[in-house]
Amino acid sequence: MVRQRLNSSPRKLAFASALAASFLLTGCDGEDSGSAPIVIDGPSITTGEGAFATSQSTARFLTQATFGPMPAQVSSLTGTSASSWCAQQRAREPTLVEPDFDAYLALAEEEGEESELMFAAPSYVFWKQAINAPDQLRLRMAFALSQILVVSDAGGEILSDVPESMVGYQDILRNHAFGNYRDLLEAITYNPAMGEWLTYMGNQKAEETGRVPDENYARELLLLFTVGIVELQPNGEPRLQNGQ
């Protein structure tokens, strides 16, 4: 599974958000659009109906929107509508982690309870599906979201000892990849993996004895998942007043 958090600078987080959002904008809105490509100050993102105009632009767009195109895909899509391709991708049934994970788990149980395969299965499934799954846009979108709404199985704690927890979390990202961000936030909030990762599992309210609730998740929700602490311009740079 994904174990690395993006550099948390405002510019890097803004680009990660732009990467996730770009698939739902001009080139991937499911409709033909004549609007100009969106301009982002940073690594460029191909959008608009010109995305499939040439073999080079097709390969570039698919490299951004999938885990990498095959030459046959580039040839067949060049000259067609990028919006139509995105609409077809969004209409595909989600490829979920759980079914393939269960298959690996069955093999692991044959080898014994402590089989290394059991703990490595989420990573095996991720790469297998990244290469072979037909709903590439959904998987790439879920991957972008996983770099923002981070949960990790690194560190030898519960999330690595119980690999099913990471499987369920990844499937939430895939099921909500093209949905409403508010709904996605609610889904991950009630997910045990996020509760364990950001330490609010079993959290209790404050009381007169001096007990205070763990506010780690509330802080992360505001600072990293939503509004942040600094108002940003569209290019990810801080919005200043009088140059400060």
PLM regions with names:
Residues 72-74, 78, 114-244:
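Primarily short, surface-exposed interaction patches in extracytoplasmic proteins
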Residues 24-27:
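C-terminal motif of bacterial Sec signal peptides marking the signal peptidase cleavage site
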Residues 2-15:
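Bacterial N-terminal signal peptides that target proteins for export
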Residues 31-124, 128-132, 136, 230, ...:
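N-terminal module-boundary/linker segments of secreted carbohydrate-active enzymes
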Residues 15-21:
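Hydrophobic helical h-region of N-terminal Sec-dependent signal peptides
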